[in-house]
Amino acid sequence: ETPDANNHYNCPIVTSYAENIKNNMEELATEHINFMNPFLALDNEEALKSRLFEELEAQYHLTADEINHAVDKAYAELSQVRTDIQNKGEEVLAYLAETGRTGIVLCGRPYHIDPEINHGIPELINSYGIAVLTEDSISHLSKVERPLNVQDQWMYHSRLYAAANYAKANKQLEVIQLNSFGCGLDAVTTDTVKDILTKSGRIYTVLKIDEVNNLGAARIRIRSLISAVRVRKKHKIEPKPVSPAIKRVEFTKEMRKNYTLLVPQMSPIHFEF
């Protein structure tokens, strides 16, 4: 999805959900449910077809042709869904440009789409007459200048950085990031997205939404952002895009005489490199 990113891993917690369900839900045994949780590589279409045939052929007597056809249809639909989301994002951007109104890129992980988790924040923003866009509706419109100050190796993160990079140069867009403290990797994204935006003189807002049913605090933060945006427009403060790329200093042999390396204690795998 992002060829120039360092890698394209998926969330390790999400990939372990099936194991968690298998080991903790007694109903699977008592109700005699056939619970299948094979590990599948979704980034390799041919490998996925092969693995699904291995898993499904014996139990459901499906042929390789049937599985191949189903996988082809699934990937076509996935591509179409992504295209639909991107087209809608471009449509909203065109509307904002035509009307001069403001839009907010509400960045969140896939599970933040669930109303039980986001607590109606998208609807709250809409109630102020502001358009809401997701990060994957605009991330295709920008490429982040690299290297960043983090290892950009998670697909969602790459999408998030690209969306922030696009928003920093568009004066009609603001960014609000939904953050769940249960996700350790989000601690990396909040700092990096903030860095991308604030370097260009933009406002960064993060809403920590874990276990909070009262929208009062979120409402105050959103109103504060809207007020700040109005003040900036009144004073004609324009964004000044700055590249988030950093220039790494290479440690040379000559530096060994006068420099000291501070190396934090890490696990053995970190020291392989």
What are the roles of these predicted feature ranges?
Residues E1-F273:
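An N-terminal assembly and electron-transfer interface module characteristic of large anaerobic redox
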